[in-house]
Regions:
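Helix-to-loop junctions at the C-terminal end of transmembrane segments
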Residues: 91-105, 192
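C-terminal ends and interior cores of transmembrane alpha-helices
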Residues: 114-129
Length: 225
């Protein structure tokens, strides 16, 4: 280490070196506020948070809903989540690249949101006598939509920022995802108890429609910031 520090020359150009950030700039809440307030990506960042708030809300009560509405045990509930895992792996592991090349991230985000909305509405409207086919179809649709939305929306934010701003923005997106995932389940649980078993699904679908509106009104062109 001493040899490296004393003998090896600095190769990073002086003009490209960054000034160390101030302590207040490292505050995660300040970074989140800055990203949401950025006109280039603010709507998309807010959409990212609202998406995970809604999605993690109604998915958190799925097992309870399956038990109370369809009298499902662990086996059928596990099968439903297994379908989610398989479909999500196929979409994100093999299909997302060709689909982005053909449709672009913006259209894929809207398509994915439409699929998630459809899946979230199909679950509470499924006839108990057709529960297996209805629910398994619904969760496959949900997984397909989520597999499209998450990488596409993240890429939309990244492409609208300069290289210097991408790291902080993507870190803020991760924080927004965690915050939505943290707040969604308890909110859905309260709605489940106070407003009825289907309220998290219909409420989540309504929130996702707002997300779709925000994304659809975001600029299509890339904007460096």
């Amino acid at each position: 280490l001493a040899v490296v520090l004393t003998l090896l020359p600095e190769t990073h150009p002086v003009t490209e070196r960054r000034v160390l950030p101030r302590k207040r700039d490292l505050n995660p809440l300040a970074q989140i506020t800055r990203v949401i307030g950025n006109p280039a990506v603010g709507r998309l960042a807010l959409s990212f948070f609202l998406f995970f708030l809604a999605f993690n809300g109604f998915t958190a009560i799925l097992v309870l809903y399956f038990k109370q509405q369809f009298n499902w045990g662990p086996e059928l509930a596990t099968t439903a989540f297994l379908i989610v895992g398989v479909v999500a792996t196929v979409v994100q592991g093999g299909l997302i690249g060709p689909l982005v090349s053909r449709f672009g991230e913006w259209k894929l985000t809207l398509i994915g949101l439409g699929l998630v909305i459809a899946g979230s509405l199909l679950i509470p409207t499924t006839d108990p006598e057709q529960a297996r086919s209805g629910v398994f179809t619904a969760v496959a649709i949900l997984a397909s939509g989520t597999g499209l939305v998450t990488p596409s929306l993240r890429s939309l934010v990244s492409r609208r920022l300069s290289n210097e701003g991408q790291g902080a923005a993507l870190g803020s997106l991760q924080a927004l995802q965690s915050l939505g995932s943290f707040l969604g389940p308890p909110i859905a649980g309260v709605a489940y108890d106070l407003l009825g078993e289907t309220s998290p699904f219909f409420g989540g679908a309504g929130l996702l429609m707002l997300v779709m509106l925000l994304v659809s009104r975001s600029p299509l062109e890339e904007t460096a910031a």
